[in-house]
Amino acid sequence: MPDTAGLSGPDIINAFVKRLPNNPGVYRMFNSDGGVLYVGKARNLKKRVSNYARGIGHSNRITRMIRETVTMEFVVTRTETEALLLEANLIKRLRPRFNVLMRDDKSFPYILLTGGHRAPGIFKHRGARSRKGDYFGPFASAGAVGRTINALQRAFLLRTCTDSVFETRTRPCLLYQIKRCSAPCTYEISDEDYAGLVAEAKAFLSGKSQSVKDHLAAAMQAASADLDFEHAAVYRDRLAALSHVQSHQGINPQTVEEADVFAIHQEGGMTCIQVFFFRTGQNWGNRAYFPKADSSLGPAEVLGAFLSQFYDDKPCPKLVLLSETVEEQSLITEALSTRAGHKVQVSVPQRGEKKELVQHALTNAREALGRRLAETSSQARLLQGLAETFGLPRAPRRIEVYDNSHIMGTNAVGGMIVAGPEGFVKNQYRKFNIRSTDITPGDDFGMMREVIERRFSRLVKEHGTPAGEVKNPDAFPAWPDVILIDGGQGQVGAVRQILGEMGISDLVTAIGIAKGVDREAGRERFFMEGKQPFTLPPRDPVLYFIQRLRDEAHRFAIGTHRARRKKEIVRNPLDEIAGIGPTRKRALLHHFGTAKAVSRAAVEDLMQIDGISEAMARAIHDHFRDK
């Protein structure tokens, strides 16, 4: 390690260059706060890093980066491909200020047809492929998956209930009554016939849609010829459901079986990359990304960096189509092939259907960026207007809005949504399950106190106070400038008291929003410490903006509450007893009918069930008596 005390900029880089090898590897540049400024890779570390020590020929972005560098770290790799893969991983994990960064890196949802069960179910799946079954996707959004599953339910009558619910059914549920499920749980359909439905669903999702539709059409005609109009109508409805799926897929290529299509457009200092996903010859949707990149970087540089990061934790198809050639395209192709475990082709099509797919993606990229630029301009004006309305020193960069949701105090949750210069920042949303047992059911003050305490205690622990945050004006701040609370003077006072106890009351502006007379929108009253309550003109754009923030917080809190309540509803008391698995639970429910009846049963009655020993019967009996 060279002696680098007191050095920075080109001097520190020169000090490191002297001992660097002529090998491929990855380098990291740090500022005085310990923050990572940049992660780069090189075929030859010594040559690449020495370029930074030269005082001429650098862009303003690189010059700023060099000036702030106070130390560096290096990792030597065996090949340049390894260096590229490591670089992409580190960029996603460390999010360096001067690199091209993906903003929305949420994993893609898939459709899962479960395996290892007599009656496979169809589900939305996100994350590691740990469950046995067949995966289809990726889909661009959860909404696209939901629409597809709904249509497939109507077409193939597959179950969507969890295994635990399936095992405890004693009669068909409502989905069977409305012809959305064939009820394999209660043997309304034989295992053999249900397996046929599953096979048809697999064939459709695997791209054999026409053969499946032909089969259903033939069955419909045969039923009609036999004057079995009831079954003919069922086949007709199933065909309509499949047509509905395909109508939402838009463009479906004839010559492209499996590909991802990337198109980039730059305008107004911003970048949009539109990605379309094609699998089994079907369009599974598209998603627009707005990567953070310096305005001095051209489309080839941004798209190349984006591509390397995009597949860091996602499966790569055999074909990747681009709107233009990227830097180090052959190296990126080799890295993607290594990561995927199969040959990947990366190309810029010049003619034919592939060219049309890229042009379609490019059109969508232009339109999406145009909308984002308009929204960003409008958002900036609204934030400045909010600052003027509420007497803030500057336009807020981060606003947090809190709301609670519960039914008579049960399944209580708190929700926090976040907004900034580019709109809602959904990867910053947080939910809080209310834990305290001391809170009286329905005590909104107590719930808000717990949420605020937990939120800001963790914020201080992880990021320190705003003065201690790493100086990075381009990064989205961790600390809010403003918090909006659903409530009046009492809620604002309670929040100020909590922040005061933590010694941070002067760091955040708290604003309360109380619903107007008769809870009418547009007549809200606003509360701040040291000010009289006030209202805003009904047509004030700032009022509309605050209403949108409040409504989004309300939507998020209610959605979180409903999810928790639904989970609580399907939970069976028998699941809490050690030693009671699906088989014993099914036997108990089949005999007694409900968990409540099981709880009232005597030990002798429990022992009558196959698989329930005396010891297990006493364990069940004691479990309910101890409650």
Swiss-Prot record:
**Keyword ATP-binding recorded:** no
- Keywords tagged on the record: Cytoplasm, DNA damage, DNA excision, DNA repair, Excision nuclease, SOS response
Q: Where is the UVR domain?
A: 210-245
Q: Kindly list the GO molecular function terms attached to this UniProt entry.
A: DNA binding; excinuclease ABC activity
GO BP field: nucleotide-excision repair; SOS response
User: What are its GO cellular component terms?
Assistant: cytoplasm; excinuclease repair complex
Q: Could you tell me where this protein is found in the cell?
A: Cytoplasm
Looking up InterPro entries in the UniProt record yields:
GIY-YIG_endonuc, GIY-YIG_endonuc_sf, GIY-YIG_UvrC_Cho, Hlx-hairpin-Hlx_DNA-bd_motif, RuvA_2-like, UVR_dom, UVR_dom_sf, UvrABC_protein_C
Tell me one Pfam family matched here: UVR
* Domain GIY-YIG stretches: 22-100
The family database entries (PROSITE patterns) matched by this protein are listed as: GIY_YIG, UVR, UVRC
Q: SMART domains recorded for this chain?
A: GIYc, HhH1
Taken from the UniProt record, the cysteine pairs bridged by disulfide bonds within this chain are none
SUPFAM superfamilies, sorted: C-terminal UvrC-binding domain of UvrB (SSF46600), GIY-YIG endonuclease (SSF82771), RuvA domain 2-like (SSF47781)
Entry-linked NCBIfam families = PRK00558.1-5 (NF001824), uvrC (TIGR00194)
Q: Which HAMAP family match?
A: UvrC (MF_00203)
- Assembly with partners or alone: Interacts with UvrB in an incision complex.
As for what it does, the entry says:
The UvrABC repair system catalyzes the recognition and processing of DNA lesions. UvrC both incises the 5' and 3' sides of the lesion. The N-terminal half is responsible for the 3' incision and the C-terminal half is responsible for the 5' incision.
Family assignment from sequence similarity = Belongs to the UvrC family.
Protein's name in the database: UvrABC system protein C
Q: Which gene encodes it?
A: uvrC
